[in-house]
């Protein structure tokens, strides 16, 4: 017998925070990906530019650790950013085997464009929530994430 309402989620799932977070994350990821693609960018571009802008020049390995991107993906994304002159690579004066990556003025302008686009995406994602609930949700998600990413005791 076929379920007469195939889009209705079982109550056991709909009441699980893990299920709700996963489903929301899938939709959020799609919105971010589509939003950035509309301005010819990717999420890795934003993450790398934001990391460089906040922390300054860094090695590719440090960028990967700080932005949560695997080193092989860092290299590919940096190649794309360098082609557009949003970043420059130069040999590290203290270790010539390593490159130091620096954001350029064009990269900072691109970062501002991406921030504006991502603000629109956040508004779309969180449309049903008023500003105070958006802030509450962000605070609660940050707390849960911090709990699960802190080093073991």
Roles of regions detected by a PLM:
Residues 23, 27, 51-55, 140, ...:
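Short amphipathic alpha-helical elements of helix-turn-helix/winged-helix folds
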């Amino acid at each position: 017998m076929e379920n007469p309402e195939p889009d209705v989620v079982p109550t056991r799932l709909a009441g699980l925070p893990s299920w709700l977070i996963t489903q929301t994350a899938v939709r959020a990821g799609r919105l971010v990906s589509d939003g950035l693609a509309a301005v010819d960018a990717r999420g890795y571009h934003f993450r790398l530019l934001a990391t460089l802008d906040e922390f300054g020049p860094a090695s590719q390995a440090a960028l990967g650790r700080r932005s949560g991107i695997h080193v092989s993906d860092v290299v590919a994304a940096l190649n794309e950013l360098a082609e557009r002159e949003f970043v420059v690579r130069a040999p590290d004066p203290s270790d010539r085997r390593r490159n130091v990556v620096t954001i350029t003025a064009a990269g900072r302008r691109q970062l501002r464009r991406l921030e504006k686009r991502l603000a629109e995406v956040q508004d779309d994602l969180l449309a049903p929530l008023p500003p105070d609930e958006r802030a509450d949700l962000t605070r609660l998600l940050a707390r849960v994430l911090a709990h699960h990413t802190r080093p073991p005791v």
